[in-house]
């Protein structure tokens, strides 16, 4: 997150100031504010896997830039559009100075969510104006034009929002695509937007697993709707939210989501692997960067298939039924029969 998310210990930005002391020159910008562990952890992760690509999004602009002077709700003030674009530039530059390259950003996490802690409302017209007149030009002027911008970053119930942003030609020239969550709506919304603008990418960027759920049911739901569903509807990325939490689903802000289970639960030296871990494990090891989705019939069991750069074929299949199901794989004149246990998912690989 660019600044605090609702899963930070407290709400903050990198340019917090009293309301009566605005900082339009960002003299007090401080990338070390807030989560002290974040930058060292990202550096350690990138040392292990330098090829990892990172995406960043803010939950809120600094309060002094907002109409309500608070980190929850409110909108970006019209006279703060330029300095907020500069805020993104300063963040990207500060992270690069620490060896952390951010490959993509969204202007606002969940821009129609006014209740989260932190949060900020940004309607489609506002986002288009911010991108075309401020954020996009600021990135290019700073030599950061290769950083990809994705609009929206919210639910599948409002495809009209990203479509409105993309319909503005001046905004679209800076866009790489749209980002999506699935706390409302249907995953097929991704296809609607992709069909309207096939030259733009679709990324699925967030879905959390609740602590009040049940492992088996949650795994099947996320596999069907998020991993298989997003890929079948054109997404090139699937991100689960979030990486890790403690047994009490902490940290989170006082008004943030208190039920979000990380992919890993960390309890001292003990690590528990949860739904998001196994969901990603079914695909990440096999579907390597550069893989492409290939056709597969979906009438019997939900599935998605890929062709890897090495020529391997990957098929991820879900059986939500209460009994085992047998299915056939037909490829280049050859057939294999596979039995998948009840309420199970499998990843099949062949060359």
Q: Which role fits each region the language model picked out?
A:
Residues 1-103, 123, 133:
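N-terminal catalytic cores of secreted or lumenal carbohydrate-active enzymes
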Residues 7-11, 62-69, 111-116, 158-161, ...:
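Short acidic/His/Gly/Ser-rich catalytic and metal-binding motifs that mark active-site loops
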Residues 54, 105, 178, 230, ...:
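Conserved, mostly hydrophobic/aromatic
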Residues 83-104, 111-212:
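Active-site neighborhood of glycoside hydrolase catalytic domains
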Residues 201-279, 295-296:
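Aromatic/acidic polysaccharide-binding cleft in carbohydrate-active enzymes
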Residues 265-311:
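Glycan-recognition and catalytic regions of carbohydrate-active enzymes
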Residues 285, 296-332, 343:
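Carbohydrate-binding surface patches
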Residues 339-351:
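C-terminal beta-strand-rich structural cap/linker in extracellular carbohydrate-active enzymes
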């Amino acid at each position: 997150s660019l600044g605090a998310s609702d899963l930070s210990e407290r709400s903050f930005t990198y340019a917090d100031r009293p309301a009566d002391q605005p900082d339009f020159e960002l003299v007090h910008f401080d990338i070390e504010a807030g989560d002290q562990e974040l930058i060292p952890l990202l550096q350690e992760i990138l040392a292990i896997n330098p090829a990892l690509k990172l995406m960043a999004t803010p939950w809120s602009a600094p309060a002094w830039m907002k109409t309500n002077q608070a980190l929850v709700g409110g909108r970006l003030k019209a006279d703060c559009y330029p300095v907020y674009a500069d805020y993104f530039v300063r963040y990207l530059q500060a992270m690069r100075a620490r060896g952390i390259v951010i490959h993509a950003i969204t202007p606002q996490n969940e821009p129609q969510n006014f209740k989260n802690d932190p949060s900020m409302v940004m309607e489609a017209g506002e986002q288009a104006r911010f991108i075309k007149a401020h954020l996009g030009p600021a990135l290019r002027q700073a030599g950061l034009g290769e950083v990809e911008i994705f609009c929206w970053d919210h639910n599948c119930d409002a495809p009209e929002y990203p479509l409105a942003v993309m319909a503005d030609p001046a905004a679209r020239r800076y866009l790489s695509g749209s980002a999506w969550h699935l706390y409302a709506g249907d995953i097929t919304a991704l296809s609607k937007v992709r069909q309207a603008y096939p030259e733009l990418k679709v990324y699925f960027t967030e879905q959390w697993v609740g602590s009040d759920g049940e492992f088996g049911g949650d795994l099947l739901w996320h596999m069907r709707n998020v991993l298989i569903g997003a890929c079948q509807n054109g997404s090139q990325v699937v991100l689960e939210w979030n990486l890790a939490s403690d047994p009490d689903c902490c940290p989170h802000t006082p008004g943030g989501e208190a039920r979000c289970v990380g992919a890993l639960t960390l309890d001292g030296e003990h690590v528990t692997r949860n739904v998001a871990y196994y969901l990603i494990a079914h695909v990440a090891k096999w579907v390597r960067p550069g893989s492409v989705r290939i056709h597969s019939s979906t009438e019997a069991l939900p599935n998605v298939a890929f062709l890897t750069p090495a020529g391997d074929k990957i098929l991820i299949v879900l059986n939500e039924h209460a009994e085992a199901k047998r299915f056939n794989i037909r490829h280049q004149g050859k057939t294999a029969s596979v039995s998948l246990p009840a309420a199970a998912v499998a990843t099949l690989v062949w060359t």
